Amino acid sequence: MIDDHCHPFSLRVEPLDWDDLSLNIDPGDVASERRRADGPWRLAQELLTVRLASYLECDAAEVAVAREEASRDWSRYVTSLFADAGITDLVMDPSWPPGAAERLEEYAEMSGCSIYPMLRLDPMVDTAIEAGATARETLDYVLARMQTAAGSGYVAFKTILAYRTGLAVDPDASIGQAEESLRSEGPVRRRGKGLRDLLLRRALGVAADLGLPFQIHTGIGDSEIRLADANPLLLEELLRTPEAQAAQIVLIHGSYPWHEELAYLAATKPGVRADLSLFNLFSPVTSGERLLRILDLAPASKVLLATDGYHQPELFWFGAHVLRDSCEYASAVMREHGAREAWLGDVRSMIFEGNARSLYRL
């Protein structure tokens, strides 16, 4: 499997802590205690615990102890998890933690996978706004960084604009509007809508010229996001621009809960692809139904799979196994409706590996 979208995992052993398996990232001790209290009653955590117990050959109640023993050789343990999950390549966003982009060889060695980084644009915009840069200075800086990244091994670009000013992008935003938007009040991450809208359109044009895909966060996210701002249909006007039509765009996270909307965009926009990730970690039981709903409309040649794993290596492992279960479920339903076995085999190969290998030229 080529993991189409993920984040760095811990390079050193840390205690098993399912606090990571939560969409609530509110800071403080009270929020942390709430996550710990709710954790055992989240179905995803229950299923991850049971599955990990089977892998470690122990009772579910003994997972923490068995994992501590297994992880005494952390590198070997992490490598075994990725191998068991069948993950061979990682398309990674190394923007967090700080310094991760300089440690890609370590991630590759420990996981046993080839690592292909993508460049997230939003932190650069945030930093520029905070420093008082003009809109033109910010545009020039970010677009230049894209050019540099393309020449230094990066295979894609990414935006989490949904977390910032939302996906209701004005494709006609001007440099004047971009400058004016910098005078708005509020947190840095919510400022500069005109600038961020203008940048996205121009960045898509640069990505198209460079021949590199562009991932856009859609749908489900942690508690910082305003979910209504993450509907992929909000991108429709942007997707009609020449820059977007020339680009290869990957709408990530299955656009949860807007799966049909995502499938429609992938079916009707030649350059748009659908990535299924993240919800497999938090809504595992219905992930097969969600995959089926996308394959029911979108061409399988435009569907990619990812774990969106982060921090704890078990999340990559669990996410990949959920996706395999999901594919088996979707295949069974399609088979029941008459799909040929050879066709189903081709679809499985494409969505787990072939599509990503072709798109990112791996």
Outline where the language-model segments fall.
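Acidic (Asp/Glu)-rich catalytic clusters
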Residues: 80-84, 102-117, 145-153, 205-209, ...
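H/E-rich (His + Asp/Glu) clusters that bind or coordinate divalent metals
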Residues: 237, 245-248, 253-362
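Mid-to-C-terminal alpha-helical segments outside catalytic/metal-binding sites
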Residues: 1-4, 11, 16-55, 65-69, ...
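Divalent metal-binding pocket/active-site signature
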Residues: 152-260
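Hydrophobic faces of well-ordered beta-strands that scaffold small-molecule active sites
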Residues: 2-6, 89-92, 113-121, 157-159, ...
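Alpha-helical scaffold segments that flank or form the walls of functional sites
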Residues: 17-111, 117, 139-152
